[in-house]
UniProtKB/Swiss-Prot annotation:
The keyword Cytoplasm applies. Residues 93-165 form the PRC barrel domain. Binds ribosomal protein uS19. Belongs to the RimM family. This is Ribosome maturation factor RimM. It is found in: Cytoplasm. The gene is rimM. InterPro entries: PRC_barrel-like_sf (IPR011033), PRC_RimM (IPR056792), RimM (IPR011961), RimM_N (IPR002676), RimM_N_sf (IPR036976), Transl_B-barrel_sf (IPR009000).
Length: 184
């Protein structure tokens, strides 16, 4: 199985470097010279890292296969993957990968409120994007207090939202009737 670790952004400079949206918690281990990535779309890869450096909190990667800005523009938006067999056991001690969470039912008590559509890894905390049956997106802070249970085998996550979480995301949303999130 493959794990997405980055998405390629815009070109940087004239030597083929690109900005990268990092989707892993260990960029210093994943993005080192000589690392080869499976790329989606397949026509853009595989790609092998030539250089990696940080510029104002933005990761810049150079690839052996990309010589100039024009070639870098062609791979813009491509997704970089590693094979999960390459992951060490340390990586599996805690936490989940996006591919494990996407598609799980999001529940408040016994009420299904939607499905997990994405996981955004951010510097302060991760966010889950839950899509409701009406097609609206709700951003849920992925912290133990709000998402106390993740049951990949059972196909769901349990949410205990604080009052107002659903309204913050959408003025027309209704709080689930389960009573979860009441402060009293």
């Amino acid at each position: 199985m493959q794990l997405q670790v980055a998405r390629i952004g815009k070109p940087h400079g004239i030597r083929g470097e690109v900005t990268v949206q990092v989707l892993t918690d260990a960029p210093s281990e994943r993005f080192v010279a000589g690392t080869e990535f499976v790329v989606e779309p397949a026509s853009a890869g595989p790609l092998t890292i030539r250089s990696a450096r940080w510029n104002k909190d933005i990761l810049l990667l150079g690839f052996e296969e990309i010589a100039d800005r024009n070639a870098a523009e062609v791979i813009r938006g491509a997704k970089l993957f590693i094979e999960t067999e390459e992951l060490s056991d340390e990586d599996d001690d805690e936490g989940w990968y996006e591919h494990e969470l996407v598609g799980l039912e999001a529940r408040v008590g016994s009420q299904v409120v939607g499905k997990v559509a994405a996981l955004s890894t951010l510097p302060v905390q991760d966010l889950l994007t839950v899509t409701t049956e009406e097609g609206k997106e709700i951003l849920i802070p992925f912290v133990d207090e709000i998402v106390p249970e993740v049951n990949v085998e059972g196909g769901y996550i349990l949410i205990t939202p604080p009052s107002g979480l659903f309204e913050i995301n959408d003025e027309n949303a209704k709080e689930p009737k389960d009573g979860a999130g009441d402060d009293a």
